[in-house]
Amino acid sequence: MKQYNDLFKIIHREGYIFIASFALVSFLLASFNEKLGCIGFIATIWCIYFFRNPDRFVPISDDLVISPADGIIQEIKEASPPPELGLGDLEMIRVSIFLNIFNIHVNRIPANGKILALHYNPGKFFNASLDKASLYNERQSVLMETDQGQKIVFVQIAGLIARRIVCDLEEDNEVKMGERYGIIRFGSRVDVYLPLKTALLVSKGQTAIGGETIIADFGRKKTEEFKFERK
């Protein structure tokens, strides 16, 4: 029984219906045409691959902010967070992480703290790599306060292909860095907004690993040896 539980654990629950549907269609196609069945089988394998949900080795520190998603650091710039969160024209550092269809799309909490506000904003589906996607695309915005008293924002943004954002958070949730909190289907972007004086530890073009890559440090000794735990 444990082996079956472990198997389901490594696949995000949002993928179950897709995988089952692909498998059923593949079986039906194979009964009519072997080549079509093979194509369906390959599509089913890809679907399993897309919804993979592996454990990560998460750093243990209240001063760190980690990447909430796998992908490429596409842009780092000063920008105001989504207006629906009520922060006004406050300028923050925005780190944008672009996910292609081959990246893991499970999203993780970037820091230890408490969820202050959430807001879902329906919108368009421009290519997530475009700068205007942050403003116009469908998005789920989250405002949290870290255990060190810093306010940060992270935003799930739908892309050209992605048509569903899943966020399992609620206001007043106490959250831990690296915990899974949602997923975006299929190809997307995640923005992280940090206070202007935050020391960044990533650069544009860098590959980020959700739950592991440290993107910022709120001020502990830079020589500190960080510990990690599996989640």
Curated annotation (Swiss-Prot):
GO terms for molecular function: phosphatidylserine decarboxylase activity. Binds 1 pyruvoyl group covalently per subunit. GO terms for biological process: phosphatidylethanolamine biosynthetic process. It is a peripheral membrane protein. Heterodimer of a large membrane-associated beta subunit and a small pyruvoyl-containing alpha subunit. It comes from Rickettsia prowazekii (strain Madrid E). Transmembrane segments: none annotated. InterPro entries: PS_Dcarbxylase (IPR003817), PSD-A (IPR033175). Its EC number is 4.1.1.65. It is found in: Cell membrane. GO terms for cellular component: plasma membrane. This is Phosphatidylserine decarboxylase proenzyme. The keyword Lyase applies. Pathway: Phospholipid metabolism; phosphatidylethanolamine biosynthesis; phosphatidylethanolamine from CDP-diacylglycerol: step 2/2. Is synthesized initially as an inactive proenzyme. Formation of the active enzyme involves a self-maturation process in which the active site pyruvoyl group is generated from an internal serine residue via an autocatalytic post-translational modification. Two non-identical subunits are generated from the proenzyme in this reaction, and the pyruvate is formed at the N-terminus of the alpha chain, which is derived from the carboxyl end of the proenzyme. The record marks G187, S188 as: Cleavage (non-hydrolytic). Belongs to the phosphatidylserine decarboxylase family. PSD-A subfamily. Its cofactor is pyruvate.
